[in-house]
């Protein structure tokens, strides 16, 4: 009997079993504890998530980062309490994240701080309410994203659910009315809607009925559009909306809830700060169709010239472009002749409509617009079609108008869509026939084959430009009457070389020009190098000497070769141009003839001795002046 307890006490098997049982029990306790702690952790996390979701719904309108509403501060401490009540909710929710603030709109809260403290804080503020930023309304967001919209919609419903706590404290509600200036309105804790631009008086606080959170939400969705977008508000800037701000409501429709923080500017069309665009090629007017791609660029707008829809092509008159910038507003009366214009103004060509305007690609300052003289019509003259002034079946014996012709008989151009009729070939005639044709045209100025259009006023040109461009066009041998026959032969060689008209019936199809594209390309190059830029560039750029319609510039000699007597309009133009040149002082009889030395003929040795004799008394002092004028 005594051996058994000793054996049992010294048995290591039983001891190890006890240890195993102890470890098993400890492991079970540890497992139970871990399960309990995990359950607590899961429940705590779920509770925190639930609380955060609830707090997010109640605090959604303060997620914009706005400061507490201090615009409703007044002298009475009772007004301080509701104005700082949202700030206390924010502070309480930040420090006590798990504490649920359900009735945010109640007057008294368990975590509300004493009123006197807020009163002391606000009384010490050096700023008044007018210096503070406008309060954001309850639908103000940083963004208009879907999540923010969902939160704002849900928060408005929660706000309606918790309005029951204040109804006992509210005054008797008045009929529903909206403050017309309620654009930056704010719901305070009483449910009253305040308007920022108006003064915070007790009378204004009584003008709005109490249960209006949903009304403000739905009304301000439309009405706050008339003010600036919320993302454009600067806290330190106060904007007073005008009384007629609701008139522009339809202009901002569609700019709400576009999914971004920036305002929707798709409906706003801001005018260009520049009066004219930088590149005139981008603003060719819509009423100038593709047939005249040479068009009227925006430089015509600077000149004050209105373009007409009936103009199908324009005359390129490079020698008058510089003057048009100065004299386009000085219109001459209708029917007035301009006899002082020189023949270089006749040497114009039609712009080739098949060549784009970009072929004249120079800078806007340098390039001058090819302008038809007939586009200078003021008033209602420019708004009607001038291309109908021709009879479509009449023979086109007259080509585009020159500035030297009387403006009451000048047509614009050929019909735009028809190929030009046959034009008579140039014939080899000497230049003195010019005077013969002038006499015929002065005798019968009315014998014309085209219908005379209505009088069109034309701006007067500058005579200084006429002198400079005349010397640039004609050089030093145009009026040299010593070689008329040589000029005629040379011009005919020029005519055969360029061959502007292959046959009497030849013409370019679908164009309004009587010349080949190569000629127009040369003219475009001349325009690119500043043909009409300034007075001096007229002479410098004429090394190109492009082939014009009536002038093949082979050197300095113009190609003025007349046809038969039936070309009345052409001869009339040349006669008027030569008459204008004679008035300018370029008389063909005595200007360019080098016979100044022949004026010494009346003088003799006796006359020279009379001049050298100091004792000799002249009968008239004007005789000595006349000798001095002859450089003696």
From Swiss-Prot:
Keywords of the record, alphabetical order, are:
Activator, Cytoplasm, Nucleus, Phosphoprotein, Transcription, Transcription regulation
Biased composition range(s): Pro residues:
413-424
**Start-end of Low complexity biased regions:** 145-156, 339-360, 425-440
Polar residues: which segments have biased composition?
310-338, 372-405
Among Pfam families, the record links this protein to: TORC_C, TORC_M, TORC_N
Q: Which GO terms describe its cellular component?
A: cytoplasm; nucleus
Q: Which residues carry this modification: Phosphothreonine?
A: 151
Gene Ontology annotations of biological process type: cellular response to cAMP; negative regulation of adenylate cyclase-activating adrenergic receptor signaling pathway; positive regulation of transcription by RNA polymerase II; protein homotetramerization
Q: Example GO molecular function term?
A: transcription coactivator activity
Which residues does the record list as Phosphoserine (modified residue)?
66, 133, 145, 293, 372, 391, 556
Per UniProt, the ranges with Basic residues bias are 105-115
List where in the cell it is found.
Nucleus; Cytoplasm
For the region Disordered, give the residue spans: 105-156, 310-455
Membership in a protein family: Belongs to the TORC family.
Summarizing the function annotation, the protein's role is: Transcriptional coactivator for creb1 which activates transcription through both consensus and variant cAMP response element (CRE) sites. Acts as a coactivator, in the SIK/TORC signaling pathway, being active when dephosphorylated and acts independently of creb1 'Ser-119' phosphorylation. Enhances the interaction of creb1 with taf4. Regulates the expression of specific CREB-activated genes such as the steroidogenic gene, StAR. Potent coactivator of ppargc1a and inducer of mitochondrial biogenesis in muscle cells.
Tell me how this protein assembles.
Binding, as a tetramer, through its N-terminal region, with the bZIP domain of creb1 enhances recruitment of taf4 to the promoter. 'Arg-300' in the bZIP domain of creb1 is essential for this interaction.
Designated name of the protein:
CREB-regulated transcription coactivator 3
Native organism: Xenopus laevis (African clawed frog)
């Amino acid at each position: 009997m005594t051996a058994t307890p000793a054996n049992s006490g010294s048995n290591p098997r039983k001891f190890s079993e006890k240890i195993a049982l102890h470890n098993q029990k400890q492991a079970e306790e540890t497992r139970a504890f871990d399960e309990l702690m995990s359950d607590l952790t899961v429940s705590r996390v779920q509770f925190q998530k639930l609380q955060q979701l609830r707090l997010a719904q109640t605090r959604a309108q303060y997620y914009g980062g706005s400061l507490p509403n201090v615009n409703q501060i007044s002298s009475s401490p009772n007004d301080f309490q509701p104005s700082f009540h949202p700030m206390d909710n924010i502070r309480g929710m930040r420090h006590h994240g798990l504490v649920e603030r359900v009735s945010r709109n109640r007057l008294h809260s368990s975590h509300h701080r004493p009123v006197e403290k807020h009163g002391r804080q606000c009384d010490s503020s050096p700023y008044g309410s007018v210096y503070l930023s406008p309060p954001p309304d309850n639908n103000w967001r940083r963004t208009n994203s879907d999540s923010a919209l969902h939160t704002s919609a849900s928060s408005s419903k929660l706000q309606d659910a918790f309005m029951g706590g204040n109804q006992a404290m509210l005054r008797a509600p008045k009929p529903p009315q909206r403050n017309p200036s309620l654009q930056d309105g704010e719901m305070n804790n009483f449910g009253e809607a305040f308007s920022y631009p108006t003064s915070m008086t007790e009378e204004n606080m009584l003008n709005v009925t109490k249960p209006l959170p949903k009304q403000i939400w739905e009304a301000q969705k439309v009405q706050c559009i008339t003010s600036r977008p919320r993302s454009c508000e600067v806290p330190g800037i106060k904007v007073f909306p005008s009384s007629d701000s609701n008139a522009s409501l339809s202009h901002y429709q569609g700019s709400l809830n576009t999914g971004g923080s920036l305002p929707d500017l798709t409906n706003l069309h801001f005018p260009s700060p520049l009066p004219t665009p930088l590149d005139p090629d981008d603003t060719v007017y819509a009423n100038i169709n593709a047939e005249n791609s040479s068009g009227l660029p925006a430089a015509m707008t600077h000149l004050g010239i209105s373009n007409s829809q009936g103009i199908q092509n324009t005359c390129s008159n490079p020698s008058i472009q510089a003057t048009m910038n100065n004299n386009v507003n000085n219109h001459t009366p209708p029917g007035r002749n301009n006899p002082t214009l020189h023949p270089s103004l006749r040497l114009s060509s039609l712009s080739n409509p098949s060549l784009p305007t970009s072929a004249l690609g120079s800078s806007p300052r340098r390039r001058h617009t090819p302008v038809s003289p007939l586009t200078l019509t003021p008033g209602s003259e420019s708004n009607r079609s001038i291309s109908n002034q021709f009879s479509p079946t009449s023979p086109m014996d007259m080509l585009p108008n020159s500035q030297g012709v009387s403006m009451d008989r000048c047509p614009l151009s050929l019909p735009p869509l028809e190929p030009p009729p046959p034009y008579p070939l140039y014939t080899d005639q000497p230049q003195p026939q010019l005077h013969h044709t002038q006499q015929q045209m002065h005798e019968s100025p009315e014998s014309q084959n085209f219908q005379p259009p209505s009088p069109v006023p034309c701006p007067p040109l500058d005579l200084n430009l006429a002198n400079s461009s005349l010397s640039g066009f004609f050089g030093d041998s145009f009026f040299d009457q010593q070689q008329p026959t040589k000029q005629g032969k040379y011009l005919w060689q020029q005519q055969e070389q360029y061959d502007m008209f292959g046959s009497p019936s030849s013409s370019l199809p679908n164009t309004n020009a009587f010349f080949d594209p190569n000629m127009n390309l040369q003219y475009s190059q001349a325009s690119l190098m500043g043909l009409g830029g300034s007075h001096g560039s007229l002479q410098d750029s004429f090394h190109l000497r492009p082939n014009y319609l009536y002038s093949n510039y082979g050197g300095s000699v113009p190609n003025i070769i007349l046809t038969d007597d039936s070309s009345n309009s052409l001869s009339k133009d040349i006669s008027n141009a030569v008459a204008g040149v004679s008035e300018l002082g370029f008389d063909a009889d005595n200007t360019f003839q080098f016979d100044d030395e022949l004026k010494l003929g009346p003088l003799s040795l006796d006359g020279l001795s009379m001049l050298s004799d100091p004792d000799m008394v002249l009968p008239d002092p004007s005789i000595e002046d006349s000798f001095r004028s002859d450089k003696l």
